[in-house]
Amino acid sequence: MIESNLLVLTLVIPILTAILLIFIGKRPIIKRHVALVGTLLTLVIALINLKNVLRDGPIKVELGSWKAPYSIVFVVDIFSALLIITSIIITILVILYSYRSIGLDRERHYYYFSIMFMLIGIIGSFTTGDIFNLFVFFEVFLMSSYCLLVIGTTKIQLQETIKYILVNVVSSSFFVMGVAVLYSVVGTLNLAHISERLSQLSVHDSGLVNIVFILFIFVFATKAGVFPMYVWLPGAYYAPPVAIITFFGALLTKVGVYAIARTLSLFFNNTVSFSHYVILFLALLTIIFGCIGAIAYYDTKKIILYNIMIAVGVILVGIAMMNESGMTGAIYYTLHDMLVKASLFLLIGVMYKITKTTDLRHFGGLIKGYPILGWTFFIAALSLAGIPPFSGFYGKFYIVRATFEKGFYLSGIIVLLSSLIVLYSVIRIFLKGFFGEVEGYTLSKKVNVKYLTTIAVASTVITVIFGLSADTLFPIIKDGAETFVDPSQYIHSVLGGK
């Protein structure tokens, strides 16, 4: 009972914090502290939830007097618990970074309120136990992201927000259609119950299940930034300030990735024969087009944005394998990418603060005045590229091993080659931005970026610690992967009256 209450608190605390932020009015200093304290409290509860999951297995809470599958159910397993903790840590870093970067005008209005509601949507997506509430929480974080995108009302923000809204309105419409078709087939919305019902379906209904799979893949691939539905991502994520880009780039695409992993495991693993091949094909194309984008641009933000696509593709390769090695690598690499992308965006934000540009052709030589910033970026770049002993190596190792275990050798080779492209793209930023010389550009009077650099360094230190803790984390992550490869434990925890 206590464990169930704690699970709900990860949603209740951000909701209460958001409500309190409304009543505070236009007092940014107080808003900062309220948002930070609320997020820290949520982190404490999330850590306790992880401890309970490791001890007891997946935990659930049923709202109302009904039992599953008829009640509204929230479930936390190892993967969702780790995702929640990582999301909250990144939210804390973004809030702290925003103190000196986002501007008082944005802080006075609904900036922190939107961040809290976006966190609610993300946590809800990771914990909901039914497919319709997954749609609801998707809409919660999407509505919040619309607000964050438009705060500041610059021309580029308004342009990209309109595109972003249109894409997501279409995507959400297809989501509702998919839920409706699925309900017409199985007569339930509970994820675990849907899994049971789908396993009992006759061949006559397989065509409808295939339609549901196609609809869901379109929706979740759009959220995750998968080829060819990624076209909205580079523009929408480029437009807002760096603190908001960090929040979006590190977290939002991972909700789509999680939804693909969960529905493939529970719904389509054994009912749609071509599901793995579709996901693998899209994953490889995402990696390839992400690599092209990463080396085509000189803009530091664009380079890292296209690296998001590469990472999503790599994770989906592991998910498509749906074996222990693949899911272990996918889970670890997802957490790694969330942390390292946050670090890189925060570091690029500091570089922009100094140079007032993100174009590598217009600045250089930063290492002379900002050596800590430069070498921190170098460490984050090595981690992103998967150079051992940093965290990117371990996840990719397991994913590549999974492809070889399944006989998908070309897929494994593409993942390995993508590491070289990633390394080239980020080392190019390091060499040109910190050691390069641009004609006509001289480093101006030193800008005070100590506070922002401290937050960015702290984020990178967390990433390094995550990599160095791989031996401790992998037994936990392997247990989390088993829940996806064999979802019976998840199903039993929801429907078995635990």
Curated annotation (Swiss-Prot):
An example GO biological process term is: ATP synthesis coupled electron transport
Q: Which InterPro entries match?
A: CPA3_Na-H_Antiporter_D, NADH_UbQ_OxRdtase, ND/Mrp_TM
Indicate yes or no for the key word Transferase.
no
Organism superkingdom: Bacteria
Gene Ontology cellular component? plasma membrane
MF (Gene Ontology): antiporter activity; NADH dehydrogenase (ubiquinone) activity
Q: Which UniProt keywords apply?
A: Antiport, Cell membrane, Hydrogen ion transport, Ion transport, Membrane, Sodium, Sodium transport, Transmembrane, Transmembrane helix, Transport
Q: What does this protein do?
A: Mnh complex is a Na(+)/H(+) antiporter involved in Na(+) excretion.
Name of the protein described by the UniProt record: Na(+)/H(+) antiporter subunit D1
Organism of this sequence: Staphylococcus epidermidis (strain ATCC 35984 / DSM 28319 / BCRC 17069 / CCUG 31568 / BM 3577 / RP62A)
The major lineage groups are: Bacteria, Bacillati, Bacillota, Bacilli, Bacillales
Q: Which gene encodes it?
A: mnhD1
